[in-house]
Amino acid sequence: TKSTTLARHLAEGGHRSFCAATPREIEGLVAAGLVDDLLLANETLDTARLGALSERANITVAVDSRATIEAAASGGVRSVLIDVNVGLPRCGCEPAEAPALAELARSSGLEVRGVMGYEGHLMMVTDRAERAQRTAEAMALLTHAADEVGGDVVSGGGTGTFDVNTSCTEIQAGSYALLDTDYDTLDLPSPRRC
């Protein structure tokens, strides 16, 4: 969530869980008093920042390696999601590595809430049937990892795939509140179409 004003508005409507891409965005949410359920969806090695955030908010952090697990544990984080590469190789462990990382996280004193993955490479696939099929393939990697890792959370998706993602327990659709006009090419359910 890049706008604390918008996040506060959503909270007034009953929304309690927020996802952010950077520690700075999480800091903004915390400063705005939105501390119930925050997800830092990108890995960080900044233990000092993690420590400060963990003291002030209920934060879950994405981890995808020994180094990010060690940083989370050293920073006082209590909960993590194992970030799994589902086809966009910018972060996330390989699906086969997820169970071992979950065990490492647990042995480091962290609660493994589940898994997350980001199919960002599919967000702007304009053909809905193709987007649905490719999203299902990406999410099959994630749900298989979830079966191996355990936990209650399967987090993923995005604004461009929320309408075809049937596998996740939570969707990370960050642009949904404003729905940039770029998404009009996808024929997504939108207030502009009502």
Protein language model features and the residues they cover:
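Active-site-proximal beta-alpha core segment in soluble small-molecule metabolic enzymes
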Residues: T1-M124
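Active-site loop/helix belt of alpha/beta enzymes
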Residues: V77-S79, N85-P191
